[in-house]
Amino acid sequence: MADLASHPVGQPLGGGGVSFGTDGIRGRVGTVMTPALALQVGYWSGQVLPGDAPVLLGMDSRSSGPMLVAALEAGLTAAGREVWTLGLCPTPAVARLVNQFQAAGGLMVSASHNPPEDNGIKLFGPSGAKLSRDQQQAIEAGLRGEVRPALTSCGPTQRRTELLESYTALLENSLEGRRLDGRRIVLDLCWGSATSCAESLFRRLGAEVIALHSQPDGAAINVGCGSTHLEPLRQAVMEHGAEMGFAFDGDADRVLAVDGQGRLVDGDHILYLWGSALADADALPQQRLVATVMSNLGFERAWTARGGQLERTAVGDQHVHAAMAELGAVLGGEQSGHIISADHGMSGDGVLTALQLAALLQPGETLSDRVDQSFRSFPQRLRNVRVPDRDRRKGWQQCDGLTTAIAAAEAAMGDEGRVLVRASGTEPLLRVMVEASSQEQVDHWTDHLSELADQLLNV
């Protein structure tokens, strides 16, 4: 970390313009994500996290991970914190182990579903939940660099990779004795965090596993595979005659599935199926689920027809978590596959979700059977419009031409459709989503609004 040597005491170490997005701090390695920034994040996290218990530190398989972990460890120990490094693990392992071992908090080095050139830092508090906005702002204030860390104390470090077994034991115990004997299941491990435990755990529970992208590879993580690229999973399920398949993202905090017919089982369907099982067991208070504004109208109408309540939040699992805590809900999540079960920690967990979905099935029953009994999604399409100018992207609602066109689209579709436009919290993208009762309307309005946004915002 020679780049730190030229920084005199009292001057910033870098990161003055960095702030928390929807999922921690994330960006391109070497520009946004640097060792200097990671050292600062580690130091100020060490100052903000309460108590004097250890801080856990994990990473996904990205090539830049060890470099950033080393810098975070240096910053944390400089703040006087004891650090336990977990090595390669899923993000939810950090959250669950923080809670199990009563740690002060945890940091995960990962950029989730982003490309290999990116990396990021996710932070968790003592309960394993993501940091509060007040805690994030306290760290951001430190990153503005008005005072350089004194770096006068040094906490101890321990390598505790064996703790991953404690995490997998929690997952196995969540099934309460249910097994997966005889189930042929494809797992797309995405060259990422899921390679650390998912395949071995499914096999231990009796499943016949076909594993794709099953070794950690920092240069290939998320490339043409995983939860954002389902075709390899779908093809393998069909070729091997599997009952189902699961695709994880880079840090395994979310999962999408396909059934034996190759049909997508997204987060909405997972919530419906898992929620229905809980409701039938009288284990879903007020039959309430929490989802986001991205969830499908077909899901909402089917769940309401079943007698349930669906509460919607802004996009981001932290918003789902907050609403669940406020409402006393036990299950929530996102269409993208972040599913949170309050009975099993308050962090999205792709491996846990996959296990629970597979274990719902009765002998002789397939996932396709359950999907057939769920709901038909409204046609929905999402287009990403690249808008490099951050102010234009974040302030798209000030563009009268675009807001007028959105209002016209919503009026034309009436109660049978909707438009959702939002700026990504992690990428320079404006996301335009249209949902309607007919594919023709969806395609027309998605293309029209996306092209208009490109014309008006990129001038």
Curated annotation (Swiss-Prot):
It catalyses: alpha-D-glucosamine 1-phosphate = D-glucosamine 6-phosphate. One of its GO terms (biological process) is peptidoglycan biosynthetic process. GO terms for cellular component: cytosol. Mg(2+) binds at residues 112, 249, 251, 253. The keyword Calcium does not apply. The active site is at 112 (phosphoserine intermediate). It is an enzyme of class 5 (isomerase). The modification Phosphoserine is found at residue 112. Keywords: Isomerase, Magnesium, Metal-binding, Phosphoprotein. One of its GO terms (molecular function) is phosphoglucosamine mutase activity. Binds 1 Mg(2+) ion per subunit. Its cofactor is Mg(2+). It comes from the Bacteria. PROSITE patterns: PGM_PMM. Its EC number is 5.4.2.10. Activated by phosphorylation. NCBIfam families: glmM (TIGR01455). PANTHER family: PHOSPHOGLUCOMUTASE (ALPHA-D-GLUCOSE-1,6-BISPHOSPHATE-DEPENDENT), PHOSPHOHEXOSE MUTASE. Catalyzes the conversion of glucosamine-6-phosphate to glucosamine-1-phosphate. Belongs to the phosphohexose mutase family. This is Phosphoglucosamine mutase. It comes from Synechococcus sp. (strain RCC307).
